[in-house]
Amino acid sequence: MTLEVTDLVGGYSQIPVLKQVSFTVAKGQLVGLIGLNGAGKSTTINHIIGLLRPQKGSIKINGVSLSEDSKRYKQSIAYVPESPILYEELTLKEHIDLTIMAYNLDEKQAWQRAQKLLTIFRLDKKLDWFPANFSKGMKQKVMIVCAFLTDADLFIIDEPFLGLDPLAIRDLLALIAQRKAQGAAILMSTHVLDTAQNYCDKFVLLNEGQVTASGSLAELQAKYGNSQATLADLYLQMIERN
């Protein structure tokens, strides 16, 4: 199992936001992390990427926790945040160089991969641009390029469809499918439930910091007794029950 979250209790203070959260993401699997605003999705992600430390429970990637081997743990993750995080003083080219250095990638091979990604997202003529020159959608594309030029075992993608044009959404979904086929594990937080239903293998439904249900669409339909329900139907049913 690539990602294992076990009995995670945590948050931003001594009062836990997350309460015994457990789920897994296997190799070659895309898991949708679903929940209302304030349900605990961002807090869960911040624990996985190491910005927050668990109060109780554990998080492991390929059997290794952050405290056991921080370098190996962090280099196993590629993260695309909801709000792009770029260095204002660095050009697009320098952001790619920084990513190559941080992940200890072969420079020639990484740049070959980067050039393909830059072309896909129509950024190949903008290598000398600074973040101030980019729109929010273009900044999001920079984050996607930097994440997908790595060899990460786990991709964490937070609300990827906000700010992206339809063409970029199509291209991102194609990249996700490609990396899945190559064996990567992918955790995606999203409010776009129809897209999640069409692409995710499994779902983790969060409500008030707890996992209320998890499984494939068929498993969730069986749990809630509605074999024809969409993911949106099931999610609304879960909210009403709780």
For every predicted segment, state its role:
Residues I49:
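Helix-to-loop junction immediately C-terminal to a conserved catalytic motif
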Residues G57-E68, R72-Y73:
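Conserved ABC transporter NBD signature motif
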Residues D97, M101, K108-K126:
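Conserved ABC ATPase "signature" region
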Residues F130-F134:
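Conserved ABC ATPase signature
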Residues F155-E159:
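Catalytic Walker B motif of ABC-type/P-loop ATPase nucleotide-binding domains
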Residues S214-G215:
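ABC ATPase "signature
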